[in-house]
């Protein structure tokens, strides 16, 4: 649907940002498979500065449940290992002198259900964000109507468009959540 009203364009952009934030959050939830994004939030001390691992090392997935972290500078190996141990990943790094192997353990059924619940909670937070965007857009449209920018008919059309945007964003969030739940539960 082509949106011409700036208020609705802004609302659509904010809804897309809520979806992108949800995908980033869900990318950090471990699904029993190796994924380089698991290390996105981890930083290590590198010459006195906290540096993200993906800027200090090549992170590869040689096997479905193994992450390999190969530092560009071998002297940073110990610091990277310390950072991984200090993180909340719950994975013990194996240092072979030139790289670090991280074996992702299989998830228990109980843990899978827990993660699926976390995914649903993140999805719910994203939907709340989308609804807040709709509320802000509706308030701005009503203010525009009050100020004489829109006729009654235009206001109703724009409100319908805002609701359609909200419904679509809700469906998108549901699809993202369903995909992640499937990934977790199938392992």
UniProtKB/Swiss-Prot annotation:
GO terms for biological process: translational termination. This is Ribosome-recycling factor. Keywords: Cytoplasm, Protein biosynthesis. It is found in: Cytoplasm. Pfam families: RRF. InterPro entries: Ribosome_recyc_fac (IPR002661), Ribosome_recyc_fac_dom (IPR023584), RRF_sf (IPR036191). The keyword Secreted does not apply. The gene is frr. The keyword DNA-binding does not apply. HAMAP family: RRF. Responsible for the release of ribosomes from messenger RNA at the termination of protein biosynthesis. May increase the efficiency of translation by recycling ribosomes from one round of translation to another. Belongs to the RRF family. One of its GO terms (molecular function) is ribosomal large subunit binding. The lineage of its organism: Bacteria, Bacillati, Bacillota, Bacilli, Lactobacillales. Coiled coil: none annotated. GO terms for cellular component: cytoplasm.
